[in-house]
Amino acid sequence: MFPRRLDSPAAYGIAQAMMDGFDRHYRLFRAESARAKHRFETSDWSGQQRAQRERIEFYDLRVKECVRRLEKEFSAGAQPMDVWHQVKLHYIGLLVGHRQPELAETFFNSVTTKILHRTHFHNDFIFVRPAISTEYLENDEPGARPTYRAYYPTPESLQETLVRVVDNFQLQGEFEDLARDAGRVAEVMRPRLGPAKWRANFQIQVLSSLFYRNKGAYLVGKVINGFQELAFALPILHGTDGRYVIDAALFGEDDLQMLFSFARAYFMVDMEIPSAYVQFLRSLMPRKPRAELYNALGLAKQGKTLFYRDFLHHLRYSSDRFRIAPGIKGMVMLVFDLPSFPFVFKVIKDYYPPQKDTTREQIKGKYLLVKQHDRVGRMADTLEYSEVAFPRERFEDDLIAEIEKFAPSQLEISDRDGDGNVEVILKHVYIERRMIPLNIYLQEAFDAGPHDARARQQMERSVVEYGNAIKDLVAANIFPGDMLWKNFGVTRNGKVVFYDYDEIEYLTDCHFRRVPAPRNEEDELSGEVWWAVGPRDVFPETFGPFLLGNDAVREVFMRHHADLLDPVFWQSHKERIQAGHMYDVFPYDPERRFGAGTGSPA
């Protein structure tokens, strides 16, 4: 029960200190995001990547700062629960009129759960459900920048309006030919709008901040005509002479889903009201969960909060049971899923086969590397949780036995809260979007037979995509380590994505070598490796026997990606990366580009 009176001075002080902590966090987060504009204008690509990586750490640092302050100034952990009841009510009062209330609620949860015992992790003490609506949040102060701007072109002035749209972002520097680029956009936009008459409400709505990532800046908006809405994004790059160009025009939900993919690095966006940006983006991509949109904007903790709420909602309205995930079992990770839920859950095992020379901390380090690195659309993002409780009755007994056998240190089965509900509590778990394992996807094509044209096309496309995925990883300075088909998955849009991270290394840390010539006949006939191998030595010529046992797969692979079996390919990329070169990886199909000769946004 909430108190009828707010009579604790300490409660208000704690609430205000937490609000101060959040405001400091978002001020620093927003300032770093806003600096992306200058880094883009000055072609500071290494600085952009470094900022993207470092910004991820901001949140946890501010939470730790706030916890230390609360303990030092208020002995927060020793305060009675009636004070903590009041803390939440005071905090809700401070949120009235706040422009990031949903983020501030999540920050409150992060701090409070570091101080209180988990028996108090319910809505009386933390924000299990949001308390403040984010609907129609605006900054009404004079001179405040709106979330989006609306433009009203005529059929004759479309090109001119597009020039004005881009000009309003006030990028420092020159375009090669903005009128030309706007004309190209208008030319491809008109067919997308179809033959319909331009209605009275025809307008172009554009978000007020550009979206920065790596070498690119993206203008994001939509065209409204009558009841029709057309989402679009325009990538702005530096051309070969350093001047700006609009490289492509992306239209529709599928193009934008690729741009905002869970397998890509987070954007830098200067947002005062992030919920308004998310609401606008949801109108462009209605199938994309809000959790993933917050993630894409760099607000990963809010993404985790929304994901967990969605997950609890799904549990309430489903009845199937968690099971061991289909497919080949991993040597390092124990994977399970809920068939009706489009994600998989991964637990690090307690022990591994001898060939896996690793530790739990090393594996966590690999997953952190992926979180902080540019994923170039080829590595799935992960959500990391601790002390996650599931209803015991929703687990198949085989799965419980599997966890007890391979990860007993991570498992607790108890009524820890004393509420009569027995739970499965996992100490540490990663959650990833479910994909079709590539080996299973290929097997489906093989099972259809060699004369099935669609199956043949599926096989060819996935083998080509597999090679493209590896090459994109190489461009991002990532060596996947274990390149077996089972460690890659196929997304809903047919993209091949890597998701097994326990053996990944920076490409620049590896040594790519040729297999030495046999010294004698005994070496030549030996089935064992007879030459000396260092800890990070890689022999690309040896990949073939593990990957290309199927003749049809071998033919397609050798036609498109034979260079992956040549050490020269790997070594040349390594040397160029060491020399400071950043490879170009596009988050959209090459045929969307207006012309060659520009750098990549990625």
UniProtKB/Swiss-Prot annotation:
Signal peptide: none annotated. Keywords: ATP-binding, Cytoplasm, Glyoxylate bypass, Hydrolase, Kinase, Nucleotide-binding, Protein phosphatase, Serine/threonine-protein kinase, Transferase, Tricarboxylic acid cycle. It is found in: Cytoplasm. One of its GO terms (molecular function) is phosphoprotein phosphatase activity. InterPro entries: AceK_kinase, AceK_regulatory, Isocitrate_DH_AceK. Its EC number is 2.7.11.5, 3.1.3.-. NCBIfam families: PRK02946.1. Bifunctional enzyme which can phosphorylate or dephosphorylate isocitrate dehydrogenase (IDH) on a specific serine residue. This is a regulatory mechanism which enables bacteria to bypass the Krebs cycle via the glyoxylate shunt in response to the source of carbon. When bacteria are grown on glucose, IDH is fully active and unphosphorylated, but when grown on acetate or ethanol, the activity of IDH declines drastically concomitant with its phosphorylation. This is Isocitrate dehydrogenase kinase/phosphatase. It comes from Paracidovorax citrulli (strain AAC00-1) (Acidovorax citrulli).
